[in-house]
């Protein structure tokens, strides 16, 4: 527990018994095109499938709850990369120096959004009648890393080892990974709203809905940006004649006095039903990063806890989770072999 919350607990002895600590950790990594291991090594590897998404997200939160109120410290990282299938294919071919398809015209489209931020979250929860329960949380965030923008254009194959392109670029950043521009890091401040809702249809059926970043903006001061046309006029060739391109920019490099980075909502819903005895079923749904994800599973009550397994069809992944009293854990993966892993989720919570 951070020192602030420990000091708060000790300074309020009359309320200490009612203060309930909690910890939440969630992590997701997903790549549609190449294994996560290869994605971290600039896509170098033999495995490739056509796809349009990669993302990584991590959320750590710890704090205290007192009756209907709560306060916590949040630290988060989000990286969302979307691209056309043509973009993925060209990037993988060139990264591995594989033969390029003669006469091919690639439609290049990339959209990137990333933040690193931390801050304080205040939440309020209450019941709605006998069957419903809701929670609203507002987080004040200080951010110190950003990527926000995109690339569009076309690339034409000249021969099996060479190609050229004209690309329109418009993006804000903390580090210029495209042109190695040296800049001072911008500072960002903002907010994010988290909402949760639970409804008990009957003794055996329950609905849980959570929305992170229901409304979420980061306001960046003195934010570096690049806007213009990138061409392939500067080329180098290796000993085998395969091209390596250092883009040439014709356009603007500047500093925005203020820019707004908007974060998209991420939805999660779970509908669970208990059948006769210790058995049950559940249906799960996620909407995030322009993807609809569906999971279907079964539950088994064990003592005071519950074990469940779910199959997520889009990722072809299996989830195993365990909950007992205030403690919960789950892991989701599409492969057991680390070198082939394309989707992995981890979740750990106490007092959630």
Question: Would you name each region that the model predicts?
Answer:
Residues 221-352:
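Outer membrane beta-barrel transmembrane domains
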Residues 153-226:
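Loop-centered beta-sheet repeat module
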Residues 17-183, 228-246, 265, 331-352:
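A subset of solvent-exposed loop/turn segments in beta-rich extracellular surface proteins, enriched
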Residues 1-18:
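Gram-negative bacterial Sec-dependent N-terminal signal peptides
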Residues 55-57, 115-117, 190, 199, ...:
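Short solvent-exposed loop/turn micro-motifs enriched in small/polar/acidic residues
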Residues 21-25, 71-73, 134-138, 195, ...:
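Membrane-embedded beta-strand positions of outer-membrane beta-barrel proteins
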Residues 15-19, 62-70, 126-134, 199-204, ...:
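Short loop/turn motifs that connect adjacent beta-strands in outer-membrane beta-barrel proteins
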Residues 58-66, 118-126, 193-199, 209, ...:
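Residues on the lipid-exposed face of transmembrane beta-strands in outer-membrane beta-barrel proteins
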